Amino acid sequence: MDCRGLLCGMGNTGSMTSADELNEQYDADGSVTQVPERNDEVHAGESAVAQSRESAVTIPAGTVVLAATPIGNVGDASARLVALLERADIVAAEDTRRLYDLARRLGVYVNGRVIAYHDHNERDKADGLLDQVETGATVLVVSDAGMPTINDPGLAIVRRAIERGLPVTCAPGPSAVLDALALSGLPTDRFCYEGFLPRKHSERVQYLRTLLPERRTIVFYETPHRIADSMDDLLD
């Protein structure tokens, strides 16, 4: 097909990682070597830097905060995300198990109340969370990976917060859409995001044909087990 499209494969970024795995690094040839232990002075210095960085992060009271989480690389977690995980009153997580896995890898203790907040319950839970915001609570919303609301939960609470006149902000970070776009080599001055393609071949082909007149760069999401078929359809 003639339309200029970019497929972004969405894999499982929430796998469990052991302490030993976190203490390994990959050489250029793909082999694994052990990271040398750092001395106490280095650890103390890093701890002081971390404390200074945390004190510089303001946690807004009475606010909904959408925070981006790492996509496969825990090193992409921002200082704001770390502080929010530690200090938010309520953490609304797409998958609580993955949240605690992320917190463990970051060395963070989640002090606030954690609730499951996903596609199947976000509309029902939005107003209850916003009632807490009205009392001054900081409600942190996180998805499994990337930015909430981008094919992830979060839209319902943002809409209701706007309707109720309550503040919403975000702690920016990784987003698969923008990462894929930046690395594609395709024009980025004008683009559109089309989310996931239809699962069935016939529906996918029909949908792609409607996009033929589109001259902007198009970004799609696709699952690993369907990405080859979708690429074939794009090339037809």
Spell out what each predicted region is.
Residues 9, 17-19, 23-118:
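Glycine-rich, flexible N-terminal cofactor/catalytic loop recognition
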Residues 11-46, 61-63, 175, 179-236:
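Beta-strand/loop-alpha-helix module characteristic of Rossmann-like adenine-cofactor folds
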Residues 71-72, 144-148, 224-226:
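Short glycine-rich anion-binding loops that position phosphate/pyrophosphate groups of nucleotides
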Residues 85-91, 165-169, 217-218:
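Short active-site oxyanion
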Residues 93-94, 152, 221:
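Short beta-strand scaffold positions
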Residues 117-122, 197:
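Conserved helicase motor
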Residues 134-194:
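Short glycine-cluster motifs
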